[in-house]
Amino acid sequence: MNMQAILKQAQNMQKDMMKAKEEVDNTVFVGESSLVKVEVYGTKKIKSVKINSTEPIEADEIEMLEDMFLVAINSAFEKVDKMTEEKMGKFANIPGLF
């Protein structure tokens, strides 16, 4: 394979990698835990936080609600990580692309 063909192949791989990254970044992932629903972008920036309760939150329920937020956020982030690995993992062992 000549040098020009190698460079062309590397450019195509880089384009594919950027397309995969853009797809992950623009995807919205949802994490939920009982009363809490969190939406995050693939960039791990939080899009929205919802508390699904028609009842007022009592003072003694605050710690439980905080735990629900942690579970929901971590769940959404795990989904981001999983999709990132699925989309970007094939590029991990290619030297010079990062």
Pin down the residues of each PLM region.
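Stable alpha-helical structural segments in soluble proteins, enriched in small hydrophobic residues
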Residues: 68, 72-80
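N-terminal intrinsically disordered, cationic/polar leader segments
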Residues: 29-50, 57
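Long amphipathic alpha-helical segments used for membrane anchoring, targeting, substrate engagement
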Residues: 1-30, 79-98
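Residue-level signature of catalytic and energy-coupling elements of molecular machines
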Residues: 10, 44, 69
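A short, polar/charged loop-to-alpha-helix boundary motif
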Residues: 57-66
